[in-house]
Amino acid sequence: MSKIRVGFGFDVHQLKENHPFIVGGVHLEHHSGAFGHSDADVLLHAICDALLGAANLRDIGYHFSNTDERWRGISSLILLEHVVVLLAEKGWSIGNIDAMICLEAPKINPHVPAMKINIAKAAGISEDDISIKATTNEQLGFIGREEGVVAYAVCLIEK
């Protein structure tokens, strides 16, 4: 009998002027970008947390501490690859990933196909098993003021 689990992930990053803005491994042209220890890819961090949570392997901060210089500036696609290895070591494979990005600008939809390609390659799954959606915060709160970006992710894993 197969076993399935569901995981949920969340991440938030502050936006700062003249920082690179990387979401789903895609560099977005924008006046500000996410600030963080790694490349601050909010989408991939939420996905990593969802996967780790589903497998009961703690969270992204446990595995990739922001006090560890090995992870400074690293591509979050590499972090996702590490997470997939951790899951495989426990016998888990990814069924699907469903994610949501919340930000006012820039528009995400034109970049979704490239994001899905990047995530599929790093996770070793089909693009058809990845859903990425985006919404604004209707100009409310820190997201509406373009001070930050949030991502949520849900995943299904199985063995």
For every predicted segment, state its role.
Residues 143-159:
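C-terminal edge-of-domain segments
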Residues 126-129:
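Short acidic capping loops at alpha-helix termini that bridge into adjacent secondary structure
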Residues 132-136:
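Pyridoxal 5′-phosphate
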Residues 138-140:
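Glycine-rich phosphate/pyrophosphate-binding beta-alpha loops
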Residues 20, 118, 146-150:
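A glycine- and small-aliphatic-rich helix-loop capping segment at beta-alpha/alpha-beta transitions
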